[in-house]
């Protein structure tokens, strides 16, 4: 956001914001204000030696090429702005050995992760209160789409049980406080992006299947 009074922001027609971690090569260009179009659009760029270059297919770059047999990894079909892309959700769950359990999330809201952990413990019965839980969205991106909830809990449970999720599976679904998997919007676009990259199975909320 622009520092100080919002006078300058009111004067201009468009306000753009770059997001990204300095340790990663990818940057997201978001529209905070746009008098001539939607603020839901975004662009993904790659920082190279010769400058920024647009990423035409971010899904291919954000996924690990071979994670077969690796626990703690789940693939989600997310939508940021108007474009769908696949992201890799990584989780590591281990016994807390230094007193209070640690909770850490990179690229995902830590408060939402704590809520999902509470749902897993209260509604499903998984005992994670004495476990360290680390979550990472690969590529250094920050994702706010609630549809990746399902991949977050899948990655956490996969790591906790040390059981890998089949690499051909993609998913999308929002998790409610009662433990239900809630429907998400634009499911056709999400599935289409997964099919384009060769995923053979897609896990989605039951309600979303009615319109397919």
Residues covered by each model-derived region:
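Peripheral, non-AAA+ core regions of ATP-driven protein-machinery
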Residues: 1-212
């Amino acid at each position: 956001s622009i520092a100080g009074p919002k006078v300058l922001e009111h004067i201009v027609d468009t306000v753009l914001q770059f997001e990204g971690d300095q340790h990663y090569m990818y940057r997201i260009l978001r529209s905070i204000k746009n008098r001539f179009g939607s603020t839901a659009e975004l662009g993904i760029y790659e920082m190279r030696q010769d400058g920024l270059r647009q990423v035409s297919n971010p899904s291919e770059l954000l996924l690990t090429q071979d994670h077969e047999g690796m626990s703690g990894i789940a693939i989600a079909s997310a939508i940021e702005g108007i474009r769908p892309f696949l992201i890799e959700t990584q989780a590591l769950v281990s016994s807390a050995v230094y007193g209070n359990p640690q909770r850490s999330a990179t690229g995902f809201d830590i408060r939402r992760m704590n809520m999902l952990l509470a749902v897993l413990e209260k509604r499903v019965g998984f005992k994670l209160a004495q476990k360290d839980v680390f979550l990472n969205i690969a590529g250094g991106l920050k994702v706010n789409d609630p549809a990746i909830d399902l991949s977050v809990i899948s990655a956490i449970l996969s790591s906790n049980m040390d059981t890998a999720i089949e690499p051909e599976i993609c998913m999308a679904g929002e998790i409610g406080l009662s433990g239900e998997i809630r429907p998400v919007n634009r499911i056709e676009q999400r599935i289409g992006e997964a099919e384009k990259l060769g995923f053979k199975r897609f896990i989605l909320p039951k309600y979303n299947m009615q319109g397919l």
